[in-house]
Design a protein with these regions (language model features):
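Short, acidic/polar N-cap/turn motifs at the starts of alpha helices
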Residues: 1, 18, 50-52, 89
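Short, structured beta-strand-loop surface elements
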Residues: 34-86, 93-101, 107-108
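Short beta-strand segments
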Residues: 1-35
Length: 108
């Protein structure tokens, strides 16, 4: 579990989301599933507006830049995250028509 610290795109207030993650080399990977809801989670919109954020893993705080994975990279990371989460992301995807984004958090 990691803590993602963003700034609200409208309120400019600090926001924190606790998210499951997988590692990909030095990067951290999170999935904007929102349990298969029809809309993206708020933290995803905040990342799109301001991709330079901070995460906390255990006691370590890390400055990262977020980006949405695409193509082959997305497929590979989706499969890895879904396996770690015991097929839940595939279940969530079956509940919604929106493509669920896979976000890469690259340390700066």
């Amino acid at each position: 579990m990691l803590l993602l610290r963003t700034v609200g795109r409208r309120t400019r207030e600090p926001r924190t989301a606790a998210l499951l993650y997988v590692r990909d080399g030095d990067a951290y990977v999170v999935v904007a599933s929102k349990g298969g809801a029809p809309q993206h989670p708020g933290w995803f919109h905040n990342l799109k507006a301001e991709p330079d954020v901070e995460i906390q893993v255990g006691r370590e705080r890390i400055v990262v830049r977020a980006r949405v994975s695409e193509g082959e990279e997305r497929s590979r990371l989706w499969d890895r995250a879904d396996e770690v989460n015991q097929g839940q992301y595939a279940n969530y995807q079956s509940r919604t028509k929106r493509p669920i984004p896979v976000i890469v958090l690259d340390p700066r």
